[in-house]
Amino acid sequence: MGGYNVAVVGVTGMVGQMFINVLRERNFPVKNWKLLASARSADKKINIEGKDYAIEEAAPQAFEGIDFAFFSAGGDVSKELAPEAAKKGALVVDNSSAFRMDEDVPLVVPEVNPQAASNHKGLIANPNCSTIQMVVALQPLHREAGLKRVVVSTYQSVSGSGKEAVDELAEQSRAVLNNEEPTKKNIPYKGAKKNHQIAFNMVPHLDEFEEDDYTKEEMKMIRETRKIMGIPELPLTATTVRVPVFNGHSEALTVELNSPLSPQEAREAFSKEKGIVVMDDPSELLYPMPVLTEGRDEVYVGRIRYDRSVPYGLNLWVVADNIRKGAATNSVQIAELFIERQS
């Protein structure tokens, strides 16, 4: 029987579960599954295609004989175990931020820089969810007219903070509607010195603050985009906002270009990309929204129009399922690059 031995690390989380779904949906050639999580989840079972698989504790010895290892268990676990998995011969695709800016680790979005994956040393980093959908939309514009400057404001769903944040939004909504005091534990992030209500609210704060009062999330978008697109000095600024949406990240992009590009020419460029769906018909009130993109692997682009404040500029609205294209699907697509090269 052909196929590959596949490990999923962090299998009990939202992205870990989605790894399994996406691998199955895309008919990834899995010969054997190795499901890994923390010690507290060990010996629990997950059913895949009618067969129960026991979850094992993630440890170095678990990666013996593994061909592909998909990590989504947080940066600390990745720092400890991803190099061990690579040493044992696995190709590691890591969904944490642990290695993204490491010069020796490719940071890959297959629609944008597939060639970078070839330069790996056993480990490839999956970018931040909000970065992925942005660079997929930016790449055709850069190819057609060259990027001069990018401004992005994000509207990020609570699933980006994990299942507890999703449950908290649901419970807070119920509490507020019943005139009860909502419990606040997960926004802006678990362990913050102060937590905020997300139900019926927006919070302009994702992750910790860094220099110049930018958040880590904002700096991830800036640094990762420059690395992925190979434009180290690209002028780019970001404001990231958590919104009371369960799933799906949205972004308002203002893109200044080096040469003229009309909205129609941009639509045509986007339409040529297999990873992009153009949803842009104002006369029919048609534009991307999170409820339309949930469960889909493509990046949706709409509201494409001139930015009249600069000589060559466009505004656009970009939406994607952050658990799929922003995490699991992009990781699986990276692994598929290697299978395609072997076939």
Specify the residue positions occupied by each region the protein language model found.
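Generic solvent-exposed, charged/amphipathic alpha-helical segments
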Residues: 20, 222-226, 267, 271
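A glycine-rich, Thr/Ser-enriched phosphate-binding loop motif common to dinucleotide/cofactor-binding enzymes
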Residues: 122-133, 213-222, 326-330
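N-terminal Rossmann-like NAD(P) cofactor-binding subdomain of oxidoreductases
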Residues: 1-198, 234-235, 263, 293, ...
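Oxyanion-binding "anion nests"
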Residues: 193-245
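Glycine-rich beta-alpha junction loops
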Residues: 39-41, 129-130, 154-161, 202-210, ...
